[in-house]
């Protein structure tokens, strides 16, 4: 029904456009709906749902959407390779649960593999989606067999424009997320990650993020509970931002380890607005010393800022003798090049394990130690705040006491 005002407007438009031109819409200008596939779940741990998921990727992986509905559980008894996804959207609202078979997974690199894919969103829109690495058997086996090789839960190699968001990741056998192979533009956001053991054997080596050769990686609004580095910047990481992250029980935000056998570079890193709880350190740099086939480590333009330290053993640590004994490093001092390392805005209280020491900066005698610290107010439980230093610059920014190690 046309109301008077609308009728008048309609009449005016009719008079002013007595000979309207036809506007033809190009078929290419019409957005085609995305194909949507929902894999059929087998409904039993004895049925591997990976083939059904691969079939869905074959049908909908090129620009389409693959949905794992809320309330569903998919049992993954083999590696899930997302090859064939290009500009695709994988929406996990149910549970993807990997098998706990230590026989099958032994020696595998990845459980969920993203290799040379350009354009992929792996996400939960509701926050209910879970990727379960089912790692308890691996924790128990590794406790008695240190040679047992465990897979990474989510492994990204090469490719670009990848987003992982809104999910819970739990109990990986080894590392949660790995990025390498010159991958570009990866975003991790709004993730809940926890590795917990129900036996006396801890979930060893469960790094939250291992960021290797890659550029423009962002990690934001993430919580991690684990038993190794919360975030580790490995050789080749460049332009990485970590922000608004909470880490519990970890080894902190770490550069390294670097220089074990080759020339390693980490550069252009920003880690800020971090809550670090009951970790061995809040932030730090780990480099191998010189000699014995070790290489050269270069760490440039790295900023650690606005860290809230709660019960961590150290607030900040530089290790230039990583992987070797103190006596070895007396003969083969560290030679790492540290340039433009900024530590600022650290507050809170350490665990007291090294009370009154709150930071330990052991720069290599044969290296470069361009490090500055400011607004550093972390204290030990005693109320004291000793910073141990060796080979640090006079312009460091905090009062130093000799005797650093590591």
Swiss-Prot record:
First-level EC class: hydrolase
Segments annotated as PbH1 repeats: 183-213, 214-235, 237-257, 299-320
GO biological process, alphabetically ordered: cell wall organization; pectin catabolic process
Active site: 228 (proton donor), 251
One protein family per Pfam: Glyco_hydro_28
Annotated compartments: Secreted
InterPro entries listed in its UniProt record: Glyco_hydro_28, PbH1, Pectin_lyas_fold, Pectin_lyase_fold/virulence
E.C. number: 3.2.1.-
One annotated GO molecular function: polygalacturonase activity
Signal peptide: 1-18
PROSITE patterns, per the entry: POLYGALACTURONASE (PS00502)
Alphabetically ordered keywords of this record: Carbohydrate metabolism, Cell wall biogenesis/degradation, Glycoprotein, Glycosidase, Hydrolase, Polysaccharide degradation, Repeat, Secreted, Signal
SMART domains, per database record: PbH1
Annotated function: Pectinolytic enzyme involved in the degradation of xylogalacturonan (xga), a galacturonan backbone heavily substituted with xylose, and which is one important component of the hairy regions of pectin. Activity requires a galacturonic acid backbone substituted with xylose.
Annotated protein name in UniProt: Probable endo-xylogalacturonan hydrolase A
Organism: Aspergillus fumigatus (strain CBS 144.89 / FGSC A1163 / CEA10)
């Amino acid at each position: 029904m046309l109301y008077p005002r609308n009728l008048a407007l309609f009449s005016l438009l009719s008079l002013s456009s007595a000979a309207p031109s036809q506007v033809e819409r190009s078929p290419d200008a019409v957005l085609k709906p995305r194909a949507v596939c929902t894999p059929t779940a087998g409904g039993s741990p004895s049925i591997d749902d990976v083939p059904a998921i691969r079939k869905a990727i074959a049908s909908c992986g090129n620009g389409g959407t693959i949905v794992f509905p809320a309330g569903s559980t998919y049992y993954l008894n083999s590696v899930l390779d997302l090859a064939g996804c290009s500009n695709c959207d994988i929406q996990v609202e149910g549970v993807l649960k990997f098998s706990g078979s230590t026989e099958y997974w032994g020696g595998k690199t990845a459980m969920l593999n993203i290799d040379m894919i350009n354009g992929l969103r792996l996400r939960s829109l509701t926050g209910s989606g879970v990727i379960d690495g089912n790692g308890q058997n691996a924790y128990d086996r590794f406790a008695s067999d240190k040679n047992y090789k465990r897979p990474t839960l989510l492994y990204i190699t090469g490719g670009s424009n990848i987003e992982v968001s809104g999910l819970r990741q739990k109990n990986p056998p080894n590392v949660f997320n790995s990025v390498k192979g010159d991958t570009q533009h990866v975003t991790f956001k709004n993730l809940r990650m926890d590795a917990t053991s129900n036996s006396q054997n801890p979930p060893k080596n469960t790094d939250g993020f291992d960021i290797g050769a890659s550029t423009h990686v962002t990690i934001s609004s993430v919580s991690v509970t684990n038993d190794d580095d919360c975030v580790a910047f490995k050789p080749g990481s460049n332009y990485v931002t970590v922000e608004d992250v909470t880490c519990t029980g970890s080894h902190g935000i770490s550069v390294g380890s670097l220089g074990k056998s080759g020339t390693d570079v980490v550069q252009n890193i920003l880690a800020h607005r971090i809550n670090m709880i009951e970790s061995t350190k809040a932030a730090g740099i780990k480099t191998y010393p010189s000699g014995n086939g070790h290489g050269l480590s270069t760490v440039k333009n790295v900023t650690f800022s606005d860290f809230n330290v709660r019960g961590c053993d150290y607030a900040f640590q530089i290790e230039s003798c990583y992987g070797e004994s103190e006596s070895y490093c007396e003969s083969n001092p560290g030679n790492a090049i540290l340039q433009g390392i900024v530590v600022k805005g650290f507050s809170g209280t350490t665990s007291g394990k090294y009370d009154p020491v709150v930071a330990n900066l052991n720069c290599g005698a044969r290296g470069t130690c361009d490090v500055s610290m400011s607004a550093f107010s972390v204290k030990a439980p005693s109320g004291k705040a000793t910073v141990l230093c060796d080979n640090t610059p006079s312009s460091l920014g905090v009062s130093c006491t000799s005797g650093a190690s590591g």
